[in-house]
Amino acid sequence: MKFLLVLIILYNILNSAHSAPTITAVSNGKFGVPTYITITGTGFTGTPVVTIGGQTCDPVIVANTASLQCQFSAQLAPGNSNFDVIVKVGGVPSTGGNGLFKYTPPTLSTIFPNNGRIGMILVDGPSNISGYKLNVNDSINSAMLSVTADSVSPTIYFLVPNTIAGGLLNLELIQPFGFSTIVTSKSVFSPTITSITPLAFDLTPTNVTVTGKYFGTTASVTMGSHIYTGLTVQDDGTNCHVIFTTRSVYESSNTITAKASTGVDMIYLDNQGNQQPITFTYNPPTITSTKQVNDSVEISTTNTGTDFTQISLTMGTSSPTNLVITGTNEKIVITLPHALPEGEIQFNLKAGISNVVTSTLLVTPVINSVTQAPHNGGSITISGIFLNNAHVSIVVDQNTTDIVCAPDSNGESIICPVEAGSGTINLVVTNYKNFASDPTIKTEATTSTTYTIPDTPTPTDTATPSPTPTETATPSPTPKPTSTPEETEAPSSATTLISPLSLIVIFISFVLLI
């Protein structure tokens, strides 16, 4: 009987030795995160003991002889390796579990901006995320960033410096514990302008500051068609700033655009966070005085710069295109054509894209010379400028008489009829506003001079018919008629005087007839 019991015990021992558990599959774990691992195989009986990579996987839940689960939270290194799994049943270790366990590598599910930071959500990441690093590269500048203190798995944050330009970024998430680097490219945020000051300025060089985020290390700004390049970005830790100095000329448009160091367009957000275009204005110019100097006009101004292409001159309905304009930021000199379509001219000072500032000037005729008048009447020639539509009158004994003259088209001379006489005659030449001679219109610009009539005729002083005007001035009071050639004709040189001898002959002949 005892011999039979010994045989049974030996049989069980031998049978157990031949029934060691086997492992055919093992599910992945999450690094540093308690995870139930499923082990598939055979011979999972009794109370198995499971180890993974030498670390206990516990507690063990046996579903059946072919499957069990155990909870595993150890952090095996390096995390990207394969580890052995052993299941012991009755002290007998399993077979087939070599290298079947590995961690599921962490992946990124979301990348998003967060108040100046790049936020990332890890899938299957470790509970301890403090060792993560992020290498950010904008194709020109790069920075190695650490996880911020408020990061909590699975969400991690990296604070991005303003020296990184917004736009498409190359992101390298460097993982600890031996996991591979995660590389991706994403446009997380744009270079953003929060303010530009000032946006209204004079036409003198003015420092303008552009403030925002993610400009990179250099930036460029375009005003109208002019580009300011290579501007250094100043980073105060919260915002970045770019300063450029405007030109003293009017730009072609009132828009401002800017690019980060990578060439990415900056966007401008208003106080509500809405994207808006950027526009600026010039402070309007001022005209302090206008003065005529011979054939030029001196306009004293402020805030006009040196870009005289924006200055125009209106004369009546026309705007001459061949004006000679010179000057400085405080004084503009315009040389006028000598013939004017109207007496009053208007200047338009345009501050680029700003409103036009205007000023008017009634041009005074300029007399350079007057020819001497014939003693017996005839014509005189007045030479000067701005005479093409001037009104001419003579003043004798405080009596004023308008005369109709013939101007040339160049505005440089007038031929006027004059009566016979002698002495010095006052001559008045006037430009009226709009060249109107209506006496009720008080706006006028007058210049005076004199001409002389000799007391006796000169050897060549013969009666000269008054010229027929080739051009009629605007209506004026009916001029006092001048003498006709017949009325002023001198005695004919053919008239014969009767001598005393002839008178005696005539007397004797008369006596003889009686």
Swiss-Prot record:
Q: Which UniProt keywords apply?
A: Cell adhesion, Cell membrane, Glycoprotein, GPI-anchor, Lipoprotein, Membrane, Phosphoprotein, Repeat, Signal
Q: State the SUPFAM superfamilies in the record.
A: E set domains
Q: Name one GO molecular function term.
A: identical protein binding
Please provide the Gene Ontology terms (biological process) for this protein.
aggregation involved in sorocarp development; calcium-independent cell-cell adhesion via plasma membrane cell-adhesion molecules; cell-cell adhesion; cell-cell adhesion via plasma-membrane adhesion molecules; cortical actin cytoskeleton organization; homophilic cell adhesion via plasma membrane adhesion molecules; response to curcumin; response to UV-C
Which parts of the sequence are annotated with region: Globular?
Answer: 20-453
Q: Which InterPro entries match?
A: Dictyostelium_Tiger (IPR052014), Ig-like_fold (IPR013783), Ig_E-set (IPR014756)
Q: What's a GO cellular component annotated to this UniProt protein?
A: cell-cell junction
Q: Where is the composition biased (Low complexity)?
A: 446-475, 483-494
User: What is the protein's membrane topology class?
Assistant: Lipid-anchor; GPI-anchor
Q: Which residues are glycosylated?
A: N128, N137, N207, N294, N399
What segment(s) does the record annotate as region 2 X 8 AA repeats, Pro-rich? 462-479
Localization in the cell = Cell membrane
Tell me where it mainly resides. Answer: membrane
Q: Where is the signal peptide?
A: 1-19
Give the misc comment: The expression of this stringently regulated protein during cell development is mediated through cell-surface cAMP receptors.
Protein name according to UniProt:
Contact site A protein
Name of the coding gene: csaA
